[in-house]
């Protein structure tokens, strides 16, 4: 999929989902960004769900366990019970409300960067496939809009255990995986 920088316009009633690894996950615990979104658009009645998990990678079935459904289920939920077999386990999910993500904030690349230059082609192919599939999706609120967030750099937080060489190596890999 071709990617170009554009301005994101949020519309009244948009359902926003955060997906990806640790950067998205941490925003469940530190909701500053979500708060700013609601503050900037108080009349929009936005619904935000954070589906990020530190172990997730693009192209790898998110949710690190065979006993948990993939993120696609959570992006397009309908009220009621869904019983499905995931891996070797029968699981019943109970959704209390509709949620049809039409804006997705995607935080991919950090976990994948640990594969270094050798993993870059796989990451690009997985991201391209995910984008094509996601951008072609209509969860009942029109075509999905995606915002890609680049992984953040390894910073010196002034810890006595800080390893400058490790940080420099990590940042070289992160730069490869950053748009």
PLM segments and residue spans:
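Mature N-terminal, pre-catalytic/accessory segment of carbohydrate-active enzymes
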Residues: 8-16
